Amino acid sequence: MKKAVVLLSGGLDSTTCLALAKSQGFACYALSFSYGQRHSAELCAATRIAKHMDAADHKIVTLDTALFGGSALTDASIEVPEFKESPEIPVTYVPARNTIFLAMALGYAESIGARDIFIGASSVDYSHYPDCRPEFIESFQSLANLATKAGIEGDRFTINAPLQYLSKVQTIQLGTELGVDYGLTVSCYQANEAGEACGQCDSCTFRKRGFKSAGVNDPTRYQKCVHI
């Protein structure tokens, strides 16, 4: 069976990617990261999801938190803002996060003989993160095949971002068709230890709107009820 490394945060998008990779016949090696994120309930969710979806393996890699300063997701002194429409890159941006995660996934993939890496990046319904853009994914794939023994020898890597052009509504519809239990997932930027979402951050807003517009019951446990 062909292998794939799937970046699994424990959120809605990455869980949908895991389900999609499995539906395509991959043995899925889930990879999660502990990098000092305040929403560490995601990692508990990732563990539940990997087990529930029968991943071939699930690794949680601990990174030095000093690598990720200046973000509301890693610095408790920076407040996570409520949702606001804006063209600016928000304070929830984590410096070079997807670059680092994909680099780690690439090394892991080459070591286990996997040539496919899945990431839940989307350029629709997102918060203007530069490392979620199609140009970034394409550039990293080029890098992967220039920087590895496998790539140089013609055994090329593919960076799969199947949600790249899907809205949150379409992602939820896809996941529902694949049988994803979204009640296991945690997307909130500041979920509490019980995994309850704030209902007010960007991630909560996109998620809540997505379920409503998709006509799918929202299984998220919210700390606060807000009208979206």
From Swiss-Prot:
Instruction: Report if keyword ATP-binding is assigned.
Output: yes
The family database entries (Gene3D superfamilies) matched by this protein are listed as:
HUPs
Alphabetized InterPro entries for the sequence: QueC, Rossmann-like_a/b/a_fold
Name the enzyme's class: ligase
Cofactor: binding comment = Binds 1 zinc ion per subunit.
What cofactors are annotated for this protein? Answer: Zn(2+)
Instruction: Give one GO term, molecular function aspect.
Output: zinc ion binding
GO BP annotations listed: queuosine biosynthetic process
- Reaction(s) catalysed by this chain's protein: 7-carboxy-7-deazaguanine + NH4(+) + ATP = 7-cyano-7-deazaguanine + ADP + phosphate + H2O + H(+)
**Any keyword Mitochondrion?**
no
Name the Enzyme Commission number(s) assigned to this protein.
6.3.4.20
Q: Which residues does the record give as Zn(2+) binding sites? A: C188, C198, C201, C204
Name the residues that bind ATP: L8, S9, G10, G11, L12, D13, S14, T15, T16, C17, L18
The record's family statement is:
Belongs to the QueC family.
Function, as annotated, reads: Catalyzes the ATP-dependent conversion of 7-carboxy-7-deazaguanine (CDG) to 7-cyano-7-deazaguanine (preQ(0)).
Name of this protein: 7-cyano-7-deazaguanine synthase
Organism encoding this protein: Legionella pneumophila (strain Corby)
Gene (name only): queC
